[in-house]
Amino acid sequence: QNAETQGRYLKTFTKHRESGILGTAYYEQKERQERVMTQKRIRDYGIMPGRIKTGKRNKITDVPGVRVGHCTVKEGEIHTGVTVILPGPDNAFLNPYTAAAYVHNGFGKSCGLIQIQELGTLETPIALTNTLNVGKVWDAVAEYVLRQCENDGAEALSINPVVGECNDSRINRISLRAIGAGQVKKAFDAAGEDPEEGDVGAGAGTICYGLKGGIGTSSRVIKVGEKEYTIGVLVQSNFGATEDLMVDGRPLGREILEKYGNEAEDPVKKTAFSEQDKGSIMSILATDLPVTDRQLTRIIRRLGVGIARTGAYTGHGSGEVMIGFTTANRVPTKGLRR
């Protein structure tokens, strides 16, 4: 009987693989895992930022329950994507997370921040994308939550999807608005505990300090009393003037310009070697500290200090938005009419 069952399984697997239904997803996951394993990070080059120990992966997903997924689109003039951050495995709408939002510089088009600031809760996953796709991604996240509630036998009459953005138009044909429900679904389906970094998802079209930007993440483990807690951060970086770039206290941006600036072709200088601090950076913080929304606000306001340590000065056109949530303090709403 086991042999017969196994035979049927293999036959079905082969059929799905040949049709592309199962094979494509399997190989995409395999390739993604291989890229994560071989991807170099700043510590691989001997640069050790900070003095507090990192989490196991040094990623936002070191906070238990948090997952991240990307969908990257690169076709012709399109270089963009979407990234989703899931705060936990269950339906956040029925059991919201204590959260906070802080706008360091408001040159941006993010959605959902006002209600977070007013109520101190997060009731949906957080999505990041490009500026002109905020509305389409908002709609896809709302649909995702509606389907969750339907499966849970709950009614959702008012939803607050949280969507952040950066303008990636310098290397992406942003007017094509390439991100929609299909790409958001792929990002949700790809969500896991060991996400890729760099030129992926919402970071596929971003530029940072005139160089290639992208998605970055890290984590730190702190001790309060006798108990350890984790703080993780994920950023979508798209800001900064090249000459201002600092790495571990070294004026690397100026060194790059002195060494390569005169050799670069004019189009490269215009696109890559930025003269102004403009763009944006979205910063998402997750923790398992049992803090209130007010305390979370105090924490995420410090993210601006970290950004400044890389050389930025919060230019006029640099939208700098911080969102934080804790997995420790939930605010149940099940049974309430929303």
Describe the predicted segments one by one.
Residues E4, T12, I21-Q29, Q33:
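Short, positively charged and aromatic/hydrophobic N-terminal segments
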